[in-house]
């Protein structure tokens, strides 16, 4: 299985375009999650982008995974960029669906100084209840979903391990829907 991060661009009128299709979209994602395909997903608080994490058997499955979604079909999602992880730290639990925006996490991205040791640090962060899931793309680039709404705290959790340079990390808020 290949784990993909899908960075999805939304329409200017995203909220209006998605609303009539929200129930069908959420039901589809929950069905894909029950089948082990969707790991997690949600939008940025401002609705300008969506990040969804899929577990697929082959790269050719990315297109139908996104383009068969009711949001894509309705024009609420306008473009997407897939990135495949070379190493991925799985979530320990399947969180319940939260659609009211109350579960805010932080996505941290940046290069790791030592990918092997950084992978252990991500596993340790998950065990400490700080990491939801995350991993590495080609070239030691990290994406980690951290269990905090504070960007400085999320960056600090990684930088304090010594396997990431604080100045090389960026963070953004993310609504962890599922």
Where are these regions (language model features)?
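Short S/T/G/P-rich N-terminal loop/turn motif that feeds into the first structured element of a domain
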Residues: 1-39, 86-141, 149-151, 159, ...
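Acidic/polar N-terminal loop/beta-strand segments that form early-domain functional surfaces
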Residues: 9, 43, 55
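An amphipathic, aromatic/His-enriched active-site/gating alpha helix that lines ligand/cofactor pockets
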Residues: 31-32, 57-84, 149-177
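Helix-loop segments that flank and shape redox-cofactor active sites
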Residues: 39-46
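Short acidic/glycine-enriched loop/turn segments that link adjacent beta-strands
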Residues: 46-49, 139-141
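Short connector loops at helix/strand junctions that flank enzyme active sites
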Residues: 47-49, 77, 103
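Short hydrophobic/aromatic beta-strand micro-patches
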Residues: 53-56, 109, 145-148
């Amino acid at each position: 299985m290949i784990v993909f991060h899908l960075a999805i661009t939304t329409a200017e009128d995203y909220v209006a375009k998605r609303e009539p299709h929200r129930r069908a979209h959420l039901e589809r994602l929950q069905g894909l999650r029950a089948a082990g395909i969707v790991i997690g997903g949600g939008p940025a608080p401002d609705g300008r982008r969506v990040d969804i994490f899929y577990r697929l058997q082959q790269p050719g499955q990315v297109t139908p995974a996104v383009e068969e979604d009711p949001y894509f079909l309705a024009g609420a999602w306008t473009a997407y960029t897939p990135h495949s992880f070379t190493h991925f730290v799985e979530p320990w639990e399947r969180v319940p669906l939260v659609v009211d925006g109350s579960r805010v996490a932080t996505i941290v991205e940046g290069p790791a100084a030592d990918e092997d040791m950084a992978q252990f640090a991500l596993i340790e962060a998950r065990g400490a209840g700080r990491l939801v899931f995350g991993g590495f793309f080609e070239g030691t680039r990290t994406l980690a979903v951290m269990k905090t709404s504070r960007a400085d705290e999320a960056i600090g959790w990684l930088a304090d391990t010594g396997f990431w340079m604080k100045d090389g990390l960026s963070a953004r808020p993310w609504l962890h829907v599922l």
